[in-house]
């Protein structure tokens, strides 16, 4: 039973790394911090339905958020997205 748990943990960690690592590589960094507006679109997990906004590099675009996971390039309103991400 211990081996099965270990293999499950290794599999879970592998999946998390495969999902997270490419997103971090594609992000821009400023002063050592991730610029959340440069993170890729990510609808998250689960099957809930929340209308949210993300910055696509040019403008804010509406999308459906699943309710769990995803990344910080997610805003409750277009105004909040533009305020945080649009360059003046």
From Swiss-Prot:
Q: What is its main location?
A: secreted
Gene Ontology CC, one term: extracellular region
Tissue specificity is: Expressed by the venom gland.
Please provide the Gene Ontology terms (biological process) for this protein. envenomation resulting in negative regulation of voltage-gated potassium channel activity in another organism
Q: Give one Pfam family.
A: Kunitz_BPTI
Question: What are the alphabetically sorted keywords of the record?
Answer: Disulfide bond, Protease inhibitor, Secreted, Serine protease inhibitor, Signal
Query: Which positions correspond to the propeptide?
Result: 28-33
Paired cysteines (S-S) = 37-85, 60-81
Q: Where is the BPTI/Kunitz inhibitor domain?
A: 37-85
Describe its function: Serine protease inhibitor that inhibits trypsin at a molar ratio of 1:1.
- The protein's name in its UniProt record: Kunitz-type U15-theraphotoxin-Hs1b
Which species expresses this protein natively?
Answer: Cyriopagopus schmidti
